[in-house]
Amino acid sequence: MPRYKLTIEYDGAPFCGWQLQPVLPSVQGALEAAALATCGEAVRVHGAGRTDAGVHALGQVAHLDIAKPFRADRLRDALNAHVRPYPVAVLSTEIVPDSFEARFSAIRRHYRYRIVNRRSNLALEIGKVWRVPKPLDTDAMHRAAQVLIGKHDFTTFRDTECQAASPEKTLDVLDVVRSGDCVDIITSARSYLHSQVRSMVGSLVWVGEGRWSADDLAAALAARRRSACGPVAPPDGLYLVKVDY
């Protein structure tokens, strides 16, 4: 049975997240319905990252097995035809070995969090960025972010309902970059805890606003207590950019 790797882009706003839910619309559910319409069989679509409600993707990766063989480009086109009207696009498909697993074969996941730092309201990017009206010291944010690099117990920065067996993760990259009013927080790691990226972003915004210092961020990390975390950033600005294998 051929296995196909999909690279997918989506707007997370109308979905309850990636993961299939009984009633609410999910990205996984939309793709599985498209696969059923394409090949006439129930197919499970496995994603590399289980993004939360409202979180977007530029390069989510998934795999699926289909009994009927398809040319990769024809499968892509058929899935795109059937996934409408959802804001989901299958960017590419390729045949991969049976040993490939979208989630477990991944060696690194890259996320970007987009902030617009201005007092004026959003007009064109509502639901796509987090508008922070108070001026942010992005140099201070970047310096503080380096406290979180490396292997740590990230209990402070994970959701209380996170089901991961261990709170330890290794963060490879956490950069804060400004271009005019736009502030990007870029992070890379093999894997993350539930709500970890948004929790780190919210705490870094407190640093940028002058509410916290780098030492305060370090103390929050060391506390290993969820209540020590700063605010959790909204999902609007978070994008799964790329998955490495």
Swiss-Prot record:
Reactions performed catalytically: uridine(38/39/40) in tRNA = pseudouridine(38/39/40) in tRNA
Disulphides: none
Enzyme class: isomerase
Keywords: Isomerase, tRNA processing
One example of a Gene Ontology biological process annotation: tRNA pseudouridine synthesis
InterPro entries according to UniProt: PsdUridine_synth_cat_dom_sf, PsdUridine_synth_TruA, PsdUridine_synth_TruA_a/b_dom, PsdUridine_synth_TruA_C, TruA/RsuA/RluB/E/F_N
Binding site for substrate: 111
Gene Ontology molecular functions: RNA binding; tRNA pseudouridine(38-40) synthase activity
One Pfam family cited in the UniProt record for this chain: PseudoU_synth_1
Keyword tRNA processing: yes
Chain's role: Formation of pseudouridine at positions 38, 39 and 40 in the anticodon stem and loop of transfer RNAs.
Similarity field: Belongs to the tRNA pseudouridine synthase TruA family.
Name of the protein: tRNA pseudouridine synthase A
Organism from which the protein derives: Rhodopseudomonas palustris (strain BisB5)
GN (gene name): truA
